[in-house]
Each structure stands twice: as C-alpha cells, then as structure tokens.
From Swiss-Prot:
Species name: Pan troglodytes (Chimpanzee)
Keyword Repeat part of the UniProt annotation: yes
One Gene Ontology CC term in the entry: plasma membrane
Disulfide bonds: none
Chain intervals with Polar residues compositional bias: 820-853
Residues on Cytoplasmic side: 715-944
SUPFAM superfamilies noted in UniProt: Cadherin-like
Glycosylation, residue list: N265, N443, N547
Name the record gives this protein: Protocadherin gamma-C5
Gene3D superfamilies xref list: Cadherins
One Pfam family named in its UniProt record: Cadherin_C_2
UniProt keyword Membrane present: yes
Length: 944
C-alpha cells in the first residue's frame, strides 16, 4: 500500500465516526457504535473521548474507563487515546440468536466529575454461517410407477444468520427425471419440493443421486448441501392418496380435550402390505400444532389435545401424510386447515383514555369530563360492547366513534356533594352477555361561590380601663363552606374612624384566628363604648367578604381620686372664713364640695373629719353632703383660729381619697346679725389710677363677652328650636371638636359690682366627647339660689379662678331675666317626711346611709348664705351638676341613679325650703302646668 493510501483510509474512518456520532445524537442521545461480528481483537469501534468532547490532556485526570468487567470481556478502552476496541471475537449468533437487532450495552465512567456514559455497540451480522441440513444424506424411495409431476417434500436447510444472510433459495443438481420446486411459507421461508419430471424405470436406473444446495443471501453467499438418494422401487408403485390435498374443518374455541376434529381417509390401490397405510404428521407441522392436536396412526383420527383459544389463533394448519407398508413405502400428503370458531368467553374491557379529575363545580352542563375506550377480544356480536352509567348521577354517557364520552348532565355543587362514585358497566352482545365494571371516584373542586359568614351578627366585649395594650377582648369567628384557599379566612378591621382616629388604632384583629386585641390602653373617662366593624375575607379569586359589628364596652376602674372643688386645694393661706361665736350647735359653717371622674360606686363620695383638725370635737361633717356644722356651742376658750381637715373618700376598691382644709376665724358678733356674702369679701382700697385702668379694661372685656355670649345663646336657642331640650333650658349634648380631653374642673365665680355673688359656674370636662356646665345662680336680692343647667360647652384648658370682670357671662339671651324671687315649681312636691320643721330639727348625726334633709326655713337660708359666702371670698368653688351642694355626680353611660339616693335632695329651689321630689311625667324637662319656675333635667338626660 502506498503512502497516500493510509491518509485516505484515516479520512474514511473519521468520516464514518462523524456519521456515527451524528446518528447517535439524533437517535438516542447516547454514544452508539457498530462493529461487525467476528472482528479481530484490536479492531477500533470508536473514539469515546473524541465523541464526548474530552481533550486528550484531560484523559488521565478524568480516568476514562469501562464501568463493568462484563464490558471488558468484549471491549477494551484506551486510557491514553479514549479509543474503544474489540477485545475478543464476538459471535452475534451466540449473543442474540435469531434476533434482527443485536445491541451490546457498554458503560463508560469518567471521574472529576464522576459521570456515567452509556454506550451501545450494535453487533452487525456477518455471513459467517452456511446453511445446513438436518442430515447430510436423505434416502428417498420412489416407485417406478410414480407418475410424472409427483412432488416429494424435501428437508429445509437452517441458517443461524439473520436478514439477508439466511437461506434465500435452493438448487438441485441437474437430472432428467427430477426438478426442484420451491414454495414460500407464510413466514416467508422457502420450502423445497422434489418434482418427478418423467416416469422412472428401475431397470434403466435403480438409484438416482441428487444434490440439494441451499444458498443464503449474504455477500459473499454461503451454501450448504445434502445428498438425496432416490431409490426406484419395482413394486408398490401406487402411493396413498387423499380425497383432497387441502381439507378445511372448523372447531369452536374451548372445545373439550378429546374432541374429534377430523378422520383422515387415504386410499392406496396396491394390495397387501403395499396398501396398508399409517398416518402421521408431516415434517412441516409446527410443534404448537402437535401440542394441540393428536393423530391416530392407524385410524387417521385427529383429536383435540390442548385448549383451543380463538383469541390466541383463529387458524391452524396441519400437515398430514399417509404411508403404506409396501417396499418401498409410498406416502400421500394433505393439508388440514382448521378454522377456530369464536365463543363469547371474554368479558369486555373499559379503558380510561382521559379524565378531568377534579372537576370544577362551576363546570357548565354538557362539558366532557372523561373519555373511555371499550374493547372485547371476541368477534362479531360477541365483540360488540355497550357502556352504561349508574343512575341518579349528574353525569351521562355519550357514544362516539370508537369511544365514549362522560358529560355533565346537571349543575355541580361541591358544598352539597364533594365527590361522586361513578359505576360504568360494559356489556357485550353475546349470548349469554358478559359484563365488566369500572369504578371511578370523581372529585369536585371548589369554586369561591360562598361568602364567609360570621357566627354572630353582633359581638360584645368588655375590658377594664387601664388594661395594657395587647389584652384580648374577644374572638370573632366566621365560617366558609368552601374549601382550600376559598375557605382560608383573613380577619381585619374595616376602615372606620372613632373620634377622628382610625379604628385600627384602637383594636387589632389577628388576621388568622380572629382574636381581637386592644391596641392601646383605654380610659373610661375618655371612651366608654367603642363600635368597631370587623371584616372577614376569603382567599378566593375574586375574594368574598362579610362584616360584623363589635361593641367594646370599657369598664370603669377606680383610678381617679376625688377632686376637691371647695375649698380649692392650695388656698389654705387665703382669707379664712368667719364664724360668729354665737352660732348655735348644728350651724352650717361651710361645705366641702368634691367630684370624682370615675363612675358608679367608684364615684360615690363620703366625707369625714380627720384628727388633724384643731378641735375635732367642735365640728361635724356630713358623710354624704360634705356640710361642716358646729357640733356644740362655741366657748370663750375655743381658739380663735380653727383648722378643719376633711377627708373625702370614694367607694371604689381600693378606695382613693383627698383632703380639704378649711380655715375658720371665730369672731364675737351679734348673733342677730347674720353675715352677708359681701362681708366675706375684702374691701378694695381707695381708687387709684390703676383702678381706673382696670375699670376701662373691664368694660371693654365685658362688652366683648356680651357679644360673644349673645351669639352663643342664639345658637343655643336655635338648637332648642330644633327639638333639643325644653323651652327654657339650655342643656344639650355636643360633640367635642378636639380629641383631647381633660379630667379637670374649672370653677368660675361671677360677682356683682357690689361684691355679692351673682352666680358660680363649674365647667366639667369629662374625658369623653362632651362637656357639662353646671351653674349655681344667686339672686342679688335674696339669699336664695337659682340652680340651672347650661348646655355643654367646649372650653379651653382650665385656668385659674377668674374674678375679673371679663369672666362675667350674660344670661339675657338664653334664660329669662329674673327680677324677683321665682315661685316654687309646681312639679316639685313635699313628701310628708320633708315638710319644714322648727330650727334645730336637722339631726346632726351623719351615721346614716344618706341625709334626710329635713331642714326648717332658717337652717336652709343659713346653708345657702354660707355657700354663697364661701364662693364670694375666693376660698372655694362649688361643683355643679347633681352635686352642686356637695354631691359628686357622674353622668356616664353606666351610671344610674337607682344605686344612690336621689341627687335632688342636695339641690335647693328658690322660694322653697324643701328638697326636690320628682313628679311623675316631669323627668324629661317639660314645662309644668301653671308653673314658670326654673326647670332642671333629670340625671338620666345628663349623659356625657
């Protein structure tokens, strides 16, 4: 071979390798090579490293190697070059037999990283096997009387090669008496027959030698031969013959074993042993047929030996022969074609082709949710199948070409039925009919078609004030009949505002479990009831929601100590109150007035005298009214200056308290001359320029105040005209314009120009959204008092007590001017126990639960005068409301007057010496018939 031949061969190998790689990548994605069987050891199969794209420098580090020892038996892999070569000769027939495809798997392992590559090596068939016959020689005896055209079957040759390398055709050595005829069987294999062309003559030639050659289709072709010796017999020159060379017979499947299929009947005209026949299967009868049928050699009867199944094979072919006993024996051949009849012995089958599972509950009626195929291995009517569905289901079966459809026939509702058990019944048309059941569980998937619903339309929660943030209020619960995300609920506070602030700043709702927590510390004095809207939303698409109301009631705690209004704390060093030494026992000295911002029992106040007083036995204090009276007559040796310390305690648990200190000066005065309100005022010094300036400023401020108050009175009258309050009253509810509230009270004393007390105004700023103003008015012409309720006022931060003229309020536009003592109100009546008595009828013992207030006229006037004097000298203020004369009243949503004595026992009406008694039907502040006195609203109407 020349030097140019090697590069050409190398180039061809490279082209073959590239073609192999392309085919490998396109077909299976794995490395695939082919090699011819019986290749010499060392024959290159392919370069694995090159095909994997590995660099030659990386082969050592990657340690390319075969994955198993079994692979190394036939192949070797070069670590240096990555070439896969044949290790030993491979015999395809021993590995794969007669299979048309022979693939030998090889595993290749690389390291760093560890990879496993599957390589398939196809072993190509090599025509290395020649056709061969079962015996090298065959002796055939043919009578000389054999007719021309007689056919004699010959043995077929066998070739283990496959494809074109197997037996392709036969040839017969030339002979004038015989020729070769080759038939093709159903499996495509050639079948040789020896044909007698002309009659034999034993005398001319007693033996004929024929060579039968079988040639395969390989390149180069291989062949095999057998020697056929034909012996010509002189006698028995008639061979057995059948009525027909092809016999057709039918038998039903599942025929019992032993059933007679056919009785062969061949004839031989010879006599004697030459005419005695033996029957047997021909050489071309398959082993399967021999297992199913049996042939009686003497009678020729064919019986069933095994199970006949139409589905296994509908047709059988039996080759039979009849041989006489002549010398030589003669044979006759026939073919029995057995047709198997179908019996309905196979139940139909239902095959699920497609099923939408689960099915949306919103699926429209008529939607296909499943496809089914049916089949029956039987034939004819035995193979005709119908499919039915169980009744009372919202589904129906619709037949189509080659399949059945499962459709919805009614609307679906998952909340009513979450799944359906569907029974499908397949039946064939055979007799008897066979059936097959198929059970399907069809789930219904949820659609968000149900809104969540709260278990309650209204939830109520209670919480004590001052509880820390995060306190659990209650738990709201909702349910949703949907499932999954459609039933996954999220709770929230619906965006509304409370007192100008978002509701979410007051409470927090756990979005997962609906627990409601306080976001802040609640103050009962600021807020008594909170209305919240809680919403719930599911997680469906689109989401559905629902709302419920939550009322949170804040419960009062005793967190406010009593606030002393009179005497005002810090005024201990102001001008003391004067008390004549001639005052009889039981005389009203002063009155301690206090209020409590709490409610209910926490606001019930009691008064007691502390031992720190100068002379504890000299004075008595009323437990419920705070009135300080003399316990005995004053003596000469009593100290001229008396300090009375009064303890004010509420009824809470634990109770809170405050103290009030009253300074008294004992004076020697004529007991007939009772002090006036003006006597308690300090006389101003002589007028100076400063006084003039003050008068001018007072006039200016008074004018401005008059204009302002006139405007406010007009608005008040407009509100009364709209139906809020009675005709002469100015007491109504008003929302606070500011969210800031104060828990203080500001007393405001208004005096006349002569120094006498005109009226006293106490503005209470409770901690909710309303203000209450209570005014005690004193007529300048009498020692009585007018007690009125003004409408709620929105005032600024309470300041110090105002005695300047600019603090005077005009009542001309809101209340009718009173120029004289008002007559007693006809809607207040005396009870029998309240009729006035003589002086000193008041019992000084305050150990009872509440004072009975049975005062005579003189004692009542003395109390009113003392109250006016206390306010006039600036040493005290009087708390308004129902506790103007000392009773602490709390008007809140949870405070009822049923728990305490009637507050009107401490309210004094001008022109009367008795306490108030409610007349039926007058609690709403309506004008009484025939009366024009001052009117007062019931405590039920005086809510904050």
């Amino acid at each position: 071979m020349g030097p140019k031949t090697l590069p050409q061969l190398a180039g061809k190998w490279q082209v073959l390798c590239m073609l192999s790689l392309c085919c490998w990548g396109w077909v299976s994605g794995q490395l695939r090579y082919s090699v011819v069987e019986e290749s010499e050891p060392g024959t290159l199969v392919g370069n694995v490293a090159q095909d994997l794209g590995l660099k030659m420098t990386d082969l050592l580090s990657r340690r390319l190697q075969l994955g198993s020892e079994e692979n190394g038996r036939y192949f070797s892999l070069s670590l240096m070059s990555g070439a896969l070569a044949v290790n030993q000769k491979i015999d395809r027939e021993s590995l794969c037999g007669a299979s048309t495809s022979c693939l030998l798997p090889v595993q290749v392992v690389t390291e760093h990283p560890l990879e496993l590559i599957r390589v398939e090596v196809e072993i190509l068939d090599l025509n290395d096997n020649s056709p061969s016959f079962a015996t090298p020689e065959r002796e055939m005896r043919i009578s000389e009387s054999a007719a021309s055209g007689a056919r004699f079957p010959l043995d077929s040759a066998q070739d283990p090669d496959v494809g074109t390398n197997t037996v392709s055709f036969y040839t017969l050595s030339p002979n004038s008496h015989f020729s070769l005829n080759v038939k093709t069987l159903k499996d495509g294999k050639p079948f040789p027959e020896l044909v007698l062309e002309q009659q034999l003559d034993r005398e001319a030639q007693a033996r004929h030698q024929l060579v039968l050659t079988a040639v395969d289709g390989g390149t180069p072709a291989r062949s095999g031969t057998t020697l056929i010796s034909v012996i010509v017999l002189d006698i028995n020159d008639n061979a057995p013959t059948f009525q027909s060379s092809v016999l057709r017979v039918g038998i039903p499947e599942n025929a019992p074993i032993g059933t007679l299929l056919l009785r062969l009947n061949a004839t031989d005209p010879d006599e004697g042993t030459n005419g005695q026949l033996d029957y047997s299967f021909g050489d071309h009868t398959s082993e399967a047929v021999r297992n199913l049928f049996g042939l009686d050699p003497s009678s020729g009867a064919i019986h069933v030996l095994g199970p006949i199944d139409f589905e296994e094979s509908r047709f059988y072919e039996i080759h039979a022969r009849a041989r006489d006993q002549g010398q030589p024996a003669m044979e006759g051949h026939c073919v029995i074609q057995v047709e198997v009849g179908d019996v309905n012995d196979n139940a139909p089958e239902v095959l699920l082709a497609s099923l939408a599972n689960p099915v949306l509950e919103s699926t429209p009626v008529g939607t296909v949710v499943g496809l089914f195929n049916v089949r029956d291995r039987d034939s004819g009517r035995n193979g005709e199948v119908s499919l039915d569905i169980s009744p009372d289901l919202p589904f129906q079966i619709k037949p189509s070409e080659n399949h059945y459809s499962l459709l919805t026939s009614q609307p679906l509702d998952r909340e009513a039925t979450s799944h359906y058990i569907i029974e499908l019944l397949a039946s064939d048309a055979g007799s008897p009919s066979l059936h097959k059941h198929l059970t399907i569980r069809l789930n219904i998937s949820d659609v968000n078609d149900n809104a969540p619903r709260f278990n309650q339309q209204l939830y109520t929660a209670y919480i004590l004030e001052n509880r820390p943030p995060g306190s659990l209020l209650c738990t709201v619960a909702a349910s949703d009949p949907d499932t999954g995300d459609n039933a996954r609920l999220t709770y929230s506070v619906v965006g509304n505002q409370v007192q100008g602030a978002p509701a979410s700043s007051f409470v927090y709702v756990n979005p997962e479990d609906g627990r409601v927590f306080a976001q802040r510390t609640f103050d009962y004095e600021l807020l008594q009831m909170l209305q919240i809207v809680v919403g719930v939303r599911d997680s469906g698409s689109p989401p559905l929601h629902a709302n419920t109301s939550l009322h949170v009631f804040v419960l009062d705690e005793n967190d406010n100590a009593p606030a002393v209004l009179h005497p005002r704390p810090g005024w201990e060093h102001s001008a003391p109150q004067r008390l004549p030494r001639s005052a009889p026992p039981g005389s009203l000295v002063t009155k301690v007035t206090a209020v409590d911002a709490d409610a209910g029992h926490n606001a019930w106040l009691s008064y007691s005298l502390l031992p720190q007083s100068t002379a504890p036995g000299l004075f008595l204090v009323s437990t419920h009214t705070g009135e300080v009276r003399t316990a005995r007559a004053l003596l000469e040796d009593d100290s001229d200056t008396q300090q009375v310390v009064v303890l004010v305690r509420d009824n809470g648990d634990p109770s809170l308290s405050s103290t009030a200190t009253v300074l008294l000066v004992l004076e020697d005065e004529d007991p007939e001359e009772m002090p006036k309100s003006s006597d308690f005022l300090i006389h101003p010094p002589e007028r100076s320029d400063l006084t003039l300036y003050l008068i001018v400023a007072l006039a200016t401020v008074s004018l401005l105040s008059l204009v302002t108050f006139t405007f406010l009175s007009a608005k008040c009258l407009q509100g009364n005209a709209d139906g809020d309050g009675g005709g002469g009253q100015c007491c109504r509810r008003q929302d606070s314009p500011s969210p800031d509230f104060y828990k203080q009270s500001s007393p405001n004393l208004q005096v006349s120009s002569d120094g006498t007390l005109k009226y006293m105004e106490v503005t209470l700023r409770p901690t909710d959204s309303q203000s209450h103003c209570y005014r005690t008015c004193f007529s300048p012409a009498s020692d009585g008092s007018d007690f009125t309720f003004l409408r709620p006022l929105s005032v600024q931060q309470p300041t110090a007590l105002a005695l300047e003229p600019d603090a005077i309020r005009s009542r001309s536009n809101t209340l009718r001017e009173r120029s004289q003592q008002a007559p007693p109100n006809t809607d207040w009546r005396f009870s029998q126990a309240q009729r006035p008595g003589t002086s000193g009828s008041q019992n000084g013992d305050d150990t009872g639960t509440w004072p009975n207030n049975q005062f005579d006229t003189e004692m009542l006037q003395a109390m009113i005068l003392a109250s006016a004097s206390e306010a006039a000298d600036g040493s005290s203020t009087l708390g308004g409301g129902a506790g103007t004369m000392g009773l602490s009243a709390r008007y809140g949503p949870q405070f009822t007057l049923q728990h305490v004595p009637d507050y009107r026992q401490n309210v004094y009406i001008p022109g009367s010496n008795a306490t108030l008694t409610n007349a039926a039907g007058k609690r709403d502040g309506k004008a009484p018939a025939g009366g024009n006195g001052n009117k007062k609203k019931s405590g039920k109407k005086e809510k904050k």
